[in-house]
């Protein structure tokens, strides 16, 4: 089988690096285009971990050139930059998996939390790529909004329980992420003397992923729920651990509900005890555990924020869009010990 040509726009950051690593070894996709805002370097010089692995040139991003050479583009760009690039590539008949927030939300919510939207036409038909809940739509899609990392871990855990929640129940989400989730650019919070041996909340009750979680609960759960979202930065390189608390209508067997919903999902692992980051770091798996005490529900989920929360989820979405096996090229072995 001839490999399908694909490209990455935005190879300089952590998610771009993860895309590079997976696509360079993908059995059905050929990476023929890698770009950033400057170009003029090889991937091994841009990412020292790839020296001696690939001599692929990094080019200056050009939507026309990208569309000419690729059937599908992965956009690992900041919000607003992504929609500008995607709009032109889509107009040239190519498919896009966008890892930014530009196509994840309704117009009203996006503009309330980000900026004016510059591609309303494509926003209206973008598919939110949470595979276990949108597989059929993804297969038919031309544009995928790749979910955010916190929403991925939170939604996969709580969505099966929405029908069982008390009508007045809010969701309380305690989320902890490795520092790579803050991106490659150095900030005060990610500076080594700040984050080392430290743990703190940031953007409490105001993080941009809060409306994303709330909107998708309303989409798939058919009920609006108030989401109280508190993210924390941890002194870990990668990984994400989420605890979601809610109030049930009546006592349930929490693990039985998860087994019924996810029994045939190859990348959801249901655990018999609370989850841990070490078991998922370096993989595409989402591990979930849940328990209830009376009408109180606790859902515990873990993912690799750079993989299941970004780049491997993007690869899985592309696989489905291109008619390939969903799990092709996805990492399964954790970085353990």
Swiss-Prot record:
Gene Ontology terms describing biological process: L-arginine biosynthetic process
GO cellular component, one term: cytoplasm
GO terms for MF: N-acetyl-gamma-glutamyl-phosphate reductase activity; NAD binding; NADP+ binding
Subcellular localization, as worded in the UniProt entry: Cytoplasm
Pfam family of the protein (one): Semialdhyde_dh
Enzyme Commission (EC) number: 1.2.1.38
InterPro entries the record matches: AGPR_AS (IPR023013), AGPR_type-1 (IPR000706), NAD(P)-bd_dom_sf (IPR036291), NAGSA_dehydrogenase (IPR050085), Semialdehyde_DH_NAD-bd (IPR000534)
Keywords: Amino-acid biosynthesis, Arginine biosynthesis, Cytoplasm, NADP, Oxidoreductase
CDD domains from the UniProt entry: AGPR_1_C (cd23934), AGPR_1_N (cd17895)
The protein's annotated pathway: Amino-acid biosynthesis; L-arginine biosynthesis; N(2)-acetyl-L-ornithine from L-glutamate: step 3/4
PROSITE patterns the UniProt entry points to: ARGC
Active site feature: 149
Reaction(s) the record says it catalyses: N-acetyl-L-glutamate 5-semialdehyde + phosphate + NADP(+) = N-acetyl-L-glutamyl 5-phosphate + NADPH + H(+)
Function: Catalyzes the NADPH-dependent reduction of N-acetyl-5-glutamyl phosphate to yield N-acetyl-L-glutamate 5-semialdehyde.
Family of the protein in this entry: Belongs to the NAGSA dehydrogenase family. Type 1 subfamily.
NCBIfam families: argC (TIGR01850)
Name the record gives this protein: N-acetyl-gamma-glutamyl-phosphate reductase
Organism: Wolinella succinogenes (strain ATCC 29543 / DSM 1740 / CCUG 13145 / JCM 31913 / LMG 7466 / NCTC 11488 / FDC 602W) (Vibrio succinogenes)
Taxonomic classification: Bacteria, Pseudomonadati, Campylobacterota, Epsilonproteobacteria, Campylobacterales
Gene behind the chain: argC
């Amino acid at each position: 089988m001839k490999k399908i040509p694909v490209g990455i726009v935005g190879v300089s950051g952590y998610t771009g690096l993860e895309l590079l690593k997976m696509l360079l070894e993908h059995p059905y996709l050929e990476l023929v285009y890698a770009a950033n805002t400057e170009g003029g370097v090889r991937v091994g010089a841009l990412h020292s971990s790839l020296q001696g692995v690939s001599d692929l040139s990094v080019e200056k991003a050009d939507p026309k050139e990208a569309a000419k050479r690729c059937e599908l583009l992965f956009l690992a760009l900041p919000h607003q930059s992504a929609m500008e690039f995607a709009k032109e590539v889509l107009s040239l008949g190519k498919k896009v998996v966008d890892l930014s927030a530009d196509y994840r939300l309704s117009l009203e919510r996006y503009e309330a939390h980000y900026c004016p939207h510059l591609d309303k036409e494509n926003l209206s038909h973008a598919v939110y790529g949470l595979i276990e809940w949108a597989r059929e739509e993804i297969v038919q899609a031309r544009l995928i909004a790749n979910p955010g990392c916190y929403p991925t871990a939170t939604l996969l855990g709580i969505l099966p329980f929405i029908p069982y929640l008390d009508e007045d129940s809010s969701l309380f989400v305690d989320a902890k992420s490795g520092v790579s989730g803050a991106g490659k650019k150095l900030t005060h919070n990610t500076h080594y003397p700040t984050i080392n041996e430290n743990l703190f909340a940031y953007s409490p009750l105001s993080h941009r992923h809060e409306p994303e979680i709330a909107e998708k609960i309303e989409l798939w759960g058919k009920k609006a729920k108030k989401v109280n979202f508190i993210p924390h930065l941890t002194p870990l390189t990668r990984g994400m651990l989420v605890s979601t608390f809610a109030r049930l209508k009546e006592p349930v067997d929490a693990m039985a509900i998860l087994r019924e919903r996810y029994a045939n999902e190859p990348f959801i692992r249901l655990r018999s005890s609370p989850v841990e980051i070490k078991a998922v770091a370096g993989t595409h798996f989402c591990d979930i555990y849940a328990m209830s005490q009376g009408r109180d529900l606790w859902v515990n989920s873990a993912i690799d924020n750079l993989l299941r929360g970004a780049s491997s989820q993007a690869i899985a979405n592309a696989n489905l869009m291109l008619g390939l096996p969903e799990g092709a090229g996805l990492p399964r072995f954790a970085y353990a010990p």
